[in-house]
Design a protein with these regions (language model features):
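Solvent-exposed loop/turn segments at secondary-structure junctions
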Residues: 81, 150-151, 208-212, 247-252, ...
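N-terminal secretory targeting modules
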Residues: 1-9, 14-205, 210-219, 235-236
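Surface-exposed amphipathic alpha-helices with a cationic face
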Residues: 323-331
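A cross-family glycoside hydrolase active-site/sugar-binding cleft signature
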Residues: 295, 340-341
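Conserved SGNH/GDSL esterase-like catalytic core that processes O-acyl groups on lipids
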Residues: 40, 56, 61-62, 85, ...
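Catalytic His-Asp segment of secreted/periplasmic serine-dependent ester chemistry enzymes
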Residues: 259-263, 272, 302, 342-423
Length: 423
C-alpha cells in the first residue's frame, strides 16, 4: 500500500493573522448550547491557467441555499488561491425575492469585518464577517453581493454551483435588483454561511455526485439538499445544518494532474485538492460540525488514463488506506464519520468503467460495508443500482451519462441515509 502524506495548510497561518472573531470549535457543541452552525458552504478551488476572468469596479451577486435557519448569520469569504490581496469595497446580504437577482429590501444588511465595511483579504486566506442580525429560515435563498473596486482575477471559485449568479457594473450591492452585465457560472470568493443556533452541522465530503452534477440547475436537488429537507421534517433534527463539500472531479489521493496537451488542462484545476489534503479545511474547520459523510473513490479509479496520468493508478487497498486516514482524523476531532459505498458506473460515457475498476469498486464497497471501521455505513450503491445489473445505475435514476444520478437518484440517495445516525 502506498504511503499517504498528511499535509499542512498555509491558509491556517494566514487565518490566525487576520482572524477577527473567535474561531469555531472543531468538535460538535452539545445541543442546547448556543453556537455557530454551518448552514451553507462550498469548497473552493483554483482555475485553469487559461481562465482570464477578472472583475473591476463590479458587483458580484450570488445566491446560496440555506439548510438551517437562525436569528443571525455570518459569511465567510476566501482568497485562498489569489496571488494578491482581495479588496472588497462593500458586501451586503439579504433574503432573495423570487427566483431572479432581486432581494427583499427590508432584509438588506451591510456586512462588516472587524467593524469595517471595506476589507482586504490577504492572498491565501479566508475571512469571516462580523455577525449580522438577520433572521433566516431553513430552505431560504440568501443573496450575497460583493463589490470589487479594483481589478481582481477570479482565482478562487467553486466551479459547478448549478446555480446562477450575476455581475453588474459599479457598486450596486444595496440595490433591490440589478441590471446584469453577465451571468456567473461559478461561486466566486464565497465559501460559507453560518447561523446562530443550538444545533450542529453534518458535512458531506464528496465528488461530483455530492456536488450535484447533472441535477436541475437552481432547484437544489443534490442529495445533501434533500437530506437537509428530511432533517427539517423531523422535529428532533431540524436544528441540524448540512454543508456540502463536494467537488466535481475530486479524488481521495491525488490533486489534479492532467497530462500535457490533454483537454483536461482546460478544466482539471476545478477538481480541487485531494480529500486527504482538504479534510481539515472542508470538514474540521466547519462551524458546529459533529458528523461527516464520506462518498469518494470513483474518480481515483476513473481518472488515471482519462484526465490524469496512468502513473496515478491506485488499487482498492490504496483507496481503503485513504478512507482509514479520514476516519482517524475525524475521530481525533471527536466527530462521527459515516462511509458511503461507491455508486455503480458500468457503461459510463466518461471512460471510467473497466473490469479492473469494477473489481476495485466491489472490494472497496465490501470493506466499507463489512469492516466496521466507519461509525456507520450509508449504502448509496444499493440505493441507486439496477437490481437486474448491479454494476449499472437504475435507468430511472440515470442522468444519461450512466455515472451521475439525476434528481430522482439524488432523492433516493438522501432517503438511504438513516436519520437515527443523527439523533
Amino acid at each position: 500500500m502506498r504511503s499517504i502524506p498528511v499535509r499542512g495548510h498555509a491558509w491556517k497561518a494566514l487565518l490566525v493573522a487576520v482572524l477577527l472573531l473567535v474561531p469555531f470549535p472543531a468538535t460538535a457543541t452539545p445541543r442546547g448550547a448556543a453556537t455557530w452552525v454551518g448552514s451553507w458552504g462550498t469548497s473552493p478551488t483554483t482555475v485553469p491557467a487559461s481562465d482570464r476572468t477578472s472583475f473591476e469596479d463590479q458587483t458580484l451577486r450570488q445566491v446560496v441555499h440555506l439548510s438551517v435557519g437562525g436569528p443571525s448569520l455570518r459569511v465567510e469569504l476566501s482568497n485562498e488561491f489569489g496571488t494578491g490581496p482581495l479588496v472588497v469595497g462593500e458586501a451586503r446580504v439579504a433574503r432573495r425575492d423570487g427566483a431572479g437577482s432581486a432581494v427583499e429590501p427590508r432584509t438588506d444588511r451591510r456586512l462588516t469585518f472587524g467593524g469595517r465595511t471595506s476589507v482586504t483579504v490577504p492572498a491565501g486566506a479566508p475571512l469571516l464577517s462580523d455577525p449580522v442580525a438577520l433572521p433566516v429560515q431553513a430552505g431560504a435563498d440568501l443573496v450575497v453581493s460583493i463589490h470589487l473596486p479594483r481589478r481582481t482575477p477570479g482565482s478562487t471559485v467553486h466551479a459547478f454551483p448549478y446555480q446562477d449568479g450575476w455581475v453588474a457594473a459599479g457598486n450596486v450591492t444595496g440595490a433591490r435588483d440589478i441590471t446584469p452585465t453577465g451571468v456567473l457560472g461559478k461561486w466566486h470568493f464565497l465559501t460559507g454561511v453560518s447561523v446562530s443556533g443550538r444545533g450542529g452541522a453534518v458535512v458531506a465530503l464528496g465528488d461530483s455526485i455530492t456536488d450535484g452534477a447533472e441535477t436541475t440547475r437552481g432547484a437544489n436537488r443534490r442529495w445533501p439538499d434533500v437530506l437537509a429537507r428530511r432533517f427539517q421534517e423531523d422535529r428532533e433534527l431540524r436544528h441540524l445544518g448540512v454543508v456540502n463539500q463536494g467537488i466535481a472531479g475530486n479524488r481521495l489521493l491525488h490533486d489534479p494532474n492532467p497530462p500535457a496537451g490533454h483537454p483536461a488542462e482546460g478544466y482539471a484545476n476545478h477538481f480541487g485538492h485531494s480529500a486527504l489534503r482538504r479534510f481539515d479545511r472542508d470538514v474540521l474547520a466547519q462551524p458546529g460540525v459533529g458528523h461527516v459523510v464520506v462518498l469518494l473513490g470513483v474518480n481515483d479509479l476513473g481518472h488515471p488514463g482519462t484526465s490524469a496520468p496512468l502513473s496515478e493508478k491506485v488499487s482498492a487497498q490504496d483507496i481503503i488506506g485513504a478512507h482509514r486516514q479520514l476516519i482517524d482524523r475525524a475521530h481525533a476531532a471527536g466527530l462521527r464519520v459515516y462511509g458511503g459505498t461507491i455508486t455503480p458506473f458500468k457503461g459510463d460515457t466518461l471512460g471510467f468503467h473497466s473490469p479492473e475498476n469494477e473489481a476495485a469498486r466491489a472490494e472497496v464497497n465490501r470493506w466499507v460495508r463489512g469492516s466496521g471501521e466507519y461509525d456507520a455505513v450509508i449504502d448509496f450503491d444499493r440505493a441507486v443500482r439496477d437490481p437486474a445489473d448491479p454494476q449499472r445505475l437504475r435507468s430511472d435514476y440515470d442522468s444519461g451519462d450512466h455515472l451521475h444520478p439525476n434528481d430522482a437518484g439524488m432523492a433516493a440517495m438522501a432517503q438511504a441515509v438513516p436519520l437515527r445516525l443523527f439523533r
